[in-house]
Amino acid sequence: MKKYLALALIAPLLISCSTTKKGDTYNEAWVKDTNGFDILMGQFAHNIENIWGFKEVVIAGPKDYVKYTDQYQTRSHINFDDGTITIETIAGTEPAAHLRRAIIKTLLMGDDPSSVDLYSDVDDITISKEPFLYGQVVDNTGQPIRWEGRASNFADYLLKNRLKSRSNGLRIIYSVTINMVPNHLDKRAHKYLGMVRQASRKYGVDESLILAIMQTESSFNPYAVSRSDALGLMQVVQHTAGKDVFRSQGKSGTPSRSFLFDPASNIDIGTAYLAMLNNVYLGGIDNPTSRRYAVITAYNGGAGSVLRVFSNDKIQAANIINTMTPGDVYQTLTTRHPSAESRRYLYKVNTAQKSYRRR
């Protein structure tokens, strides 16, 4: 009971904290938020380990939807990178019933992340008439799953034919794994094309870049969260990118979590921030390809860190970049940027953007 209580106490705090992943604006309050959020996430992971066992900690992330129910004894895990859905339970009584209920709810859940608390065991998943996973999963007869009857039949089939169990030394873990369709990534991307096109026209940002950022940040997971509290499809942080965009639009404060979990709003804010990087923070870079490389890297690590790769003086940095070929700028950012994550990020986004340009 104590460990369940600990999780109940942690969950509200997790929702209230926020930090940053992008941008160069740091202040004391942000540092406190960052440290506090990281500590709380560590405590959350520790308590999951106490319940599930060593090496059995699974927590929601940018490309992983993870929802616990049944006093944290049942969980649904969608890996949007691998294209797998794993439903597991450690319930000591009627584990099949717990799995069946979780399978049906996961298959039929909607796409409203603001209504689901990923850090509590509250069963707040509502069955939707237009399930988020519709078309990304097919049942044993090869049909997409929209209605509860088909989801229930598929759950029964899975429990009869694919139920597995394993022991971690302390508990028996029962599980069922569902493979998503091979083109699940494209299926998710297609859901947001209209929103991407609208934001592209509004801010003058290439559609292929927006899609590449979304793929790299979240694999088109609208429930995406990170340990740095970046939220939604484009992993926007309230107090940095969100605040910058609001200020540029004449709004005070920062966008709320529910606002950033709304796909259209998230894409709008993320695209507006890309436009700010391109037109304001890195506007001194003349060559559009060189500037695109800088913008991509800055979306991950901040404009200041990009310019400092070339010079501590921002104006001089832009001047140096303007004497280089785009290929040299790319090579420099992917080899000399101090952040390994940012170096890899440019490669990933640039590669993804090429694939969207060919479509």
UniProtKB/Swiss-Prot annotation:
Membrane topology: Lipid-anchor
InterPro entries: Lysozyme-like_dom_sf, Murein_transglycosylaseC, Murein_transglycosylaseC_N, Transglyc_AS, Transglycosylase_SLT_dom_1
Catalytic activity: Exolytic cleavage of the (1->4)-beta-glycosidic linkage between N-acetylmuramic acid (MurNAc) and N-acetylglucosamine (GlcNAc) residues in peptidoglycan, from either the reducing or the non-reducing ends of the peptidoglycan chains, with concomitant formation of a 1,6-anhydrobond in the MurNAc residue
One record GO biological process: peptidoglycan metabolic process
UniProt xrefs under CDD domains: LT_MltC_MltE
One matching Pfam family: Mltc_N
Signal peptide: 1-16
Keyword set, alphabetical order: Cell outer membrane, Cell wall biogenesis/degradation, Lipoprotein, Lyase, Membrane, Palmitate, Signal
One GO cellular component term noted in the UniProt record for this chain: cell outer membrane
S-diacylglycerol cysteine lipid sites: C17
Compartmental location: Cell outer membrane
Top-level taxon of origin: Bacteria
Stated role: Murein-degrading enzyme. May play a role in recycling of muropeptides during cell elongation and/or cell division.
Name of this protein: Membrane-bound lytic murein transglycosylase C
Annotated source species: Escherichia coli (strain SMS-3-5 / SECEC)
